[in-house]
């Protein structure tokens, strides 16, 4: 299986399955002398880890990360950084009844058709469990970006049909929904409770923002910065659409509305483009939105086929998120950080 490495200079290779022994990552291309410790990476992992609230999956994984290489006396050495996380709360028996069935809406069918074999326990490699290592690697990328004054934050901007206004950035990490609006918490709670009671799931929109960038990051044509961001975000499990800036809303706009005018004193007067023009950063905030589909692992029966091609019915009884988009916030932040640190190092190599 190829496709397990991300990046050009700052590269991340991950391995591991949902119900395997461990998850691991190798980060190569990280500059030397960057202060780094397990506790720092753990802060990001704790934002993503399952079982933290009644609104997400009840699988309880501590997600304790161990640095096995690339760091000496608290600083990166410039050699590959090895990270490992042990899986501790697998319940593979939850999947024994569907080991020969393809769960509708999951990668079971396509993995089996491509490889002729699949790990049916929690989806194996296709599980969102894999994203723990992305978040760990993203923590390192964030550390480098912070040195250059670049900050990344994300928030849940919509759950189902419930749109959530951005009010208070500081509130994002103070609630289980990663929303920036304290007044919207009761509505989110009611919605998730209702969905879970129905044995169903719901989609979500996540917005991720990068601030403090200089103009000139990224490259034109096939290596456009927005293309790299879209590629990164679409690699996240359950993401079905990505937009930059105003995104699909620009369809209904006129050119006189959408163009971001510039003046000498005020600079850009708007940011409809989401901080990127011609594939290169403008120096404004980079803004991307991700659409997460509702998870297909639900208690309601669904029609499918088994490995022999016979019609069957599937009910997934494992522990699952009623809304996967909620825990998608730190993952989206990590992927944006990985894109930007890679582009930053590429830009520096051009200038050097």
Curated annotation (Swiss-Prot):
Pathway: Metabolic intermediate biosynthesis; chorismate biosynthesis; chorismate from D-erythrose 4-phosphate and phosphoenolpyruvate: step 7/7. Its EC number is 4.2.3.5. The keyword NADP applies. NADP(+) binds at residue 48. Its cofactor is FMNH2. It catalyses: 5-O-(1-carboxyvinyl)-3-phosphoshikimate = chorismate + phosphate. Reduced FMN (FMNH(2)). GO terms for biological process: amino acid biosynthetic process; aromatic amino acid family biosynthetic process; chorismate biosynthetic process. GO terms for cellular component: cytosol. Keywords: Amino-acid biosynthesis, Aromatic amino acid biosynthesis, FAD, Flavoprotein, FMN, Lyase, NADP. GO terms for molecular function: chorismate synthase activity; FMN binding. The keyword Chaperone does not apply. FMN binds at residues 125-127, 237-238, 278, 293-297, 319. CDD domains: Chorismate_synthase (cd07304). InterPro entries: Chorismate_synth, Chorismate_synth_AroC_sf, Chorismate_synthase_CS. Belongs to the chorismate synthase family. This reaction introduces a second double bond into the aromatic ring system. Homotetramer. HAMAP family: Chorismate_synth. This is Chorismate synthase.
